[in-house]
């Protein structure tokens, strides 16, 4: 009888060890939030009021392709974004081109303002802040700081 209890206690020890090893591998809602898929699901399921509550407090540190995805969410859910009343204006807006073109139709030369739209500007100063310098750090950025880099959003002043 004593021998049977000792054998059973050995199997209980083994079961306990296996359980301690396996339990951390089972995804929980809290653990899922720390994976990329979990964050995507969290961002997708948030309501407008949820976004307003976390906009200035929640920080995320993102680099490279994860930074691009984070910027997508910040631009998409920007709580200060102004909605457009009329169609989106782009650099090739016909009215703007007609106003700035002084050459007759069919000219081989572009007006200087129109030609400059095709040039990319480069930062000359290496110390100029960038989204990577700001948000690819241990502290990360708030949603508000990410949204400041949204390329096409018109935003309300909130300060």
Curated annotation (Swiss-Prot):
Signal peptide start-end: 1-31
Compartmental location: Secreted
Coiled-coil features, chain-numbered ranges: none
Propeptide: 90-121
Family the entry assigns: Belongs to the insulin family.
Quaternary structure, from the entry: Heterodimer of a B chain and an A chain linked by two disulfide bonds.
Record's protein name: Insulin-like peptide 7
Organism: Drosophila melanogaster (Fruit fly)
Gene (name only): Ilp7
């Amino acid at each position: 009888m004593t021998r049977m209890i000792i054998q059973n206690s050995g199997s209980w020890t083994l079961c306990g060890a296996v359980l301690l090893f396996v339990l951390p591998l089972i995804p929980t809602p809290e653990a899922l939030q720390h994976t990329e898929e979990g964050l995507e699901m969290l961002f997708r399921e948030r309501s407008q009021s949820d976004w307003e509550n976390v906009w200035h407090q929640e920080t995320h540190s993102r680099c490279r392709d994860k930074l691009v995805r984070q910027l997508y969410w910040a631009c998409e859910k920007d709580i200060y974004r102004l909605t457009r009343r009329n169609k989106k204006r782009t650099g090739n807006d016909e009215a703007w081109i007609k106003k700035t073109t002084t050459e007759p139709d069919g000219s081989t030369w572009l007006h200087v303002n129109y030609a400059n739209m095709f040039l990319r500007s480069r930062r000359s100063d290496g110390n100029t802040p960038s989204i990577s310098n700001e948000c690819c750090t241990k502290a990360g950025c708030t949603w508000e700081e990410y949204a400041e880099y949204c390329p096409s959003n018109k935003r309300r002043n909130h300060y």
